[in-house]
Amino acid sequence: MPSIFINIILAFIIALLGMLIFRSHLMSSLLCLESMMLSMFILSTLTILSLHLTMSFMMPILLLVFAACEAAVGLALLVTVSNTYGLDYIQNLNLLQC
């Protein structure tokens, strides 16, 4: 396995660990999700190009589309929560709070 694949997988694992560590803040969680999607995009693109899989050239583009939708929804949620509560804590998203 080339070192570029190991570096991309390591970047994904670091972003996943960041997601687990900074799970209380919405902005940090969104940044970790974006870095996870970026590493998945790069890994899928490199895999498709190195294996010459001509039938799945559209998969990285679909992954980018889903990442853009996720970013738009996440930023809208961040703006709504910060305007309502003044904080970006994820615990403010719980509708069952007393």
Swiss-Prot record:
GO MF annotation, one: NADH dehydrogenase (ubiquinone) activity
Subunit (UniProt): Core subunit of respiratory chain NADH dehydrogenase (Complex I) which is composed of 45 different subunits.
Keywords for the protein's UniProt record, in alphabetical order: Electron transport, Membrane, Mitochondrion, Mitochondrion inner membrane, NAD, Respiratory chain, Translocase, Transmembrane, Transmembrane helix, Transport, Ubiquinone
Entry-linked PANTHER family: NADH-UBIQUINONE OXIDOREDUCTASE CHAIN 4L (PTHR11434:SF0), NADH-UBIQUINONE OXIDOREDUCTASE SUBUNIT ND4L (PTHR11434)
Protein name: NADH-ubiquinone oxidoreductase chain 4L
Reaction(s) catalysed (UniProt annotation): a ubiquinone + NADH + 5 H(+)(in) = a ubiquinol + NAD(+) + 4 H(+)(out)
Function: Core subunit of the mitochondrial membrane respiratory chain NADH dehydrogenase (Complex I) which catalyzes electron transfer from NADH through the respiratory chain, using ubiquinone as an electron acceptor. Part of the enzyme membrane arm which is embedded in the lipid bilayer and involved in proton translocation.
Regions crossing the membrane: 2-22, 37-57, 61-81
Source organism of the structure: Varecia variegata variegata
Subcellular location: Mitochondrion inner membrane
Disulfide topology: none
Membrane topology per record: Multi-pass membrane protein
InterPro entries reported for this sequence: NADH_UbQ_OxRdtase_chain4L/K, NUOK/Mnh_C1-like
A GO CC term assigned to this protein in UniProt: respiratory chain complex I
Domain of life: Eukaryota
Similarity annotation: Belongs to the complex I subunit 4L family.
